[in-house]
């Protein structure tokens, strides 16, 4: 029991002269109740629970010095019943007689912007520094405030849970509340029971699932990382790994108690509100369409609870940007998790770490780390107005005016791609340590010969946040505009994979990473090359990062005419998103009868003066 009250003096403690706030939802993680006319509530005590208030519209819960919302009380008598690497929960003792929740009034929260951060996934303090100098630097420059928010979609850190303290301290520089989802790299991976797997997160951040409101939007945060999975999961085809694997594994699903809580919560939320479901593993994805473990087992049950409502799914996990429109579907979804055409929009928000902080350095000193489908690392920005919203993806340190890459897929590019991709797929212990080709072996894709045009040269446009509604047009010189075609229709087909569907702009930057070869005489072995994941060494000859953009749900293409005249040409490409926002890129390319030599002509130099 307790009181939800207006904290008039800002001390966080309930005084009798401070009025209660009525009709506020409070939950014990299963049951949901509403405060009465004096702000009082009563709920059953559960043996292991997070008791939390659901921040109502027009009000704000307090935040601590790290801008982490303070809206919950954790109850776990005896604490975590097993020793965990990062400590878990201490003994919380018996339940207190009352838990009161302070609120403060705010005005004008009908319009706000939320910075949605997928997979910052910092495995080290070095990577937190890169996060600080990329995504957070952009948010600070944007001058967020008022009723804006940040929402991390899980994998905030990479397995070292003590890094949570610093990363949220760094994120607090943006000056707005930091709401967060727990991901599979934010849990206690040495826990032997699901009930304990998020205990360190609960101590360092707060509940693993909860809800909050801003304006006319209800955000529902779910924990869909079930770790360790077991017999209940293994009974579902494709999840046999839950009992057969030597090491404990996770499965993507929302547990039964949480599903009960979700049903109880939705029963209290008016039908006219926008519901934003935030979770780490996507309900479904394009890039992992056939994978059971990386898509949510009980997505269809969640869809049933949301039927008839305006809803939006936000997730991370895949290190891709995927903007899936209602009605879209891909081969593999039905077989993996029983999902067909989507009932509402699903957005996988990309990754602030890009491709796990890999790749060579940008000018600002952070890794390029282009994602699995070639988009830059960055942040999804969503502007809310009432129950409407407009999403846009902002690449780190690239500015808001840029939203796509443009290049050409030539026969030479596809041959080069196949050579390096074949090498990548060989056993790394047995293959030649030096790749068969590098970026230096790729002919300039913007010098085209008649043979290139006859063999198929295509304009490629990677529209980072592209969706089914996106329109892409190209224009050569002063000629008429012509449409380009999305390489995936989203009509039930399988992901198309390979050189023909690769993004040349991204692959050029992913395929030869010079950081592998960094050496010095310092004597510190760990300063060679670079480290990623849990201290894994990336050393040796320059070679590709761990992912190449060999498939894409947001790539548009169009074939160049075979009879383009020789000379220098201008290409302009404009994409228009579903909200009418446009991005335009222009580049210069050449058509030459023969490809000129790429390097300094030493033969001419050494031949001396012409007679």
Feature annotation, model-predicted:
Residues 1-10, 112, 460:
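A short, Gly/Thr-enriched small/hydrophobic beta-strand-prone motif that recurs across taxa
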Residues 2-6, 39, 101:
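A short, amphipathic beta-strand motif
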Residues 12-20, 27-44:
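Short, acidic Ser/Thr/Gly-rich low-complexity loop/linker segments typical of extracellular
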Residues 28, 48-88:
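A short, solvent-exposed loop/turn motif at the edges and junctions
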Residues 70-91, 161-269, 293-314, 318-393:
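Extended active-site neighborhood of metal-dependent phosphoesterases/phosphodiesterases
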Residues 80-164, 610-611:
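N-terminal active-site segment of His-dependent metallophosphoesterases
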Residues 332-466, 470-473, 559-561, 571-588:
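Binuclear metal-dependent phosphoesterase catalytic core
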Residues 411, 433-611:
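Long, low-complexity serine/threonine/glycine- and acidic-rich segments characteristic of extracellular
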